[in-house]
Amino acid sequence: MDLTSIALNQALDYLGTFSPALYDEAQRIRHTLDAPPRIVVVGRLKSGKSTLVNALIGAPVAETAALEATNVVTVFQYGAPDRAEAVLLNGERLPITIQRGEVAALPAPVEEISFIHRWMPTASIKDFSLIDTPGLATLTVENEQRTRRILIDGYEQTKAMSVDADAAVFLFDATPRMDEVKFIKDLGFTSLNTLGVLSRADSFGEGALGERDPLDHARQHADTLAAQLSSSVLTVIPVAGLLAETSHTGVITENDARVMASLAEATEFDLIDIIASGGDAVEGGNGGGGANGGGAGGTQQQEICRRVVGLIGEYGLFRARNVARRGASELNEWATTKSGVPELRQLLVTRFGKFATTHRAGRIVKEIESLAFSRQHPKDQILNLVSTMRTDPRLITVFLLLDLKAVQDTNPNTQLIQELTRLIAGDTFQEKLGLPVTASMWDVVNTAQQKLLWAHMESLSALTPAEDAALVTIQRAYNDLIRMAQGQ
């Protein structure tokens, strides 16, 4: 257990001694603390959201058998047996019939459902839960309202009726629109726990037939977007959704590899002709019958091409035919590597996951503090507990993140945002202070003392309440750094 979790558990233990009612509250909050972080996947209609969710889970679950279920927020969580419940707006939970791993039908009208809770015994979601949403600017206004109600407005509702997300994966296919960026900010996240995904990377730019590899082009564009959106997202990762879904859901078979390999000798012009003409125009091949796939007729060739494009897209058709000669395993490995999902998953469970967990911890602190304003609980004792938590070095990053969120809302252009972000994101003394990795402990102490003086001078200026509070936490963080560096 990490130091933050230990500190929060100790605080909850103490909270539970105040009264039987607060003991129950502490146990409920502790359950939230122990659960894996929840990551919401958001994006516009046809942004590739469903294919990404399927790839991350490793099963085609985002596109359910019940069409109306795609218009409801769905939480995918690790657990057995495979089951689902509809959580209604009134807090009631109704079981949902699962057939062949898919939601067969909803037990209530969509407008009465808050969200669907789905448990799956799938190791791929053991480290984090996923929240799939109807999306932004969908075909109906109601769909976007459902997403907002559950993820934003729902925080003020009872816990049985709301979904608390700890981080967001934000999909877009070129450049995000202002309303999309605003929605992410409305979720209450910072750039540290918001991850951008440039979807459909395998068709970026000029596409599969362009002079430039679309995946390379997409990666360069993703780097540009990451710099432009640095105040909103941690980074931007290019993902080829169809390659991701196909390779991670076990769809590719040996037969698929064989029929794809039958096109290995065809030129790109052959394949274009087959797709465009229905195959008849290249019957007999273009220079020796290479496109025939061992004598297959034009119609059969077109069916093969369509099957391949349906599995791994045009990029896969044009780039992986020779790979297919080595069998389904090699083809699947190629698609996995090209998809971008391994890089995405690694980030989700490491650095990004750490920030999601810190966000969760901040939400727990705020929830403990909110208990003080209930008439049935001892206000002074709870507020004293929160005050003690603020001075706990193990929780300094949690309070820095809470301050970052508050400052972002009141003054997004203040220098404090850069200082707060650096202190939160840095793993070493040097990183937290913006120093080179080779900086000595003397350099660390000297720089921290200079920044401590700067923070003190800033606190003498006329600032917003959020900035005043942030400077107090920043000064505490610099003092902690000085103390720990001197002890090295």
Where are these regions (language model features)?
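Charged, amphipathic alpha-helical linker segments immediately N-terminal to NTP-binding catalytic cores
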Residues: 1-18
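Charged, low-complexity interaction regions
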Residues: 17-20, 460
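Pre-Walker A adenine-sensing motif
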Residues: 22-31
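Short amphipathic alpha-helical coiled-coil/interface segments
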Residues: 26, 368, 474-478
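Globular "head" domains of long coiled-coil molecular machines
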Residues: 30, 34-269, 287-293
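Short, flexible helix-adjacent loops and helix caps
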Residues: 61, 206-209, 356-357, 456-463
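C-terminal end of P-loop GTPase domains and the immediately downstream helical coupling element
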Residues: 204-207, 213, 219-397
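N-terminal J-domain/J-like co-chaperone modules of DnaJ/Hsp40 proteins
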Residues: 395-488
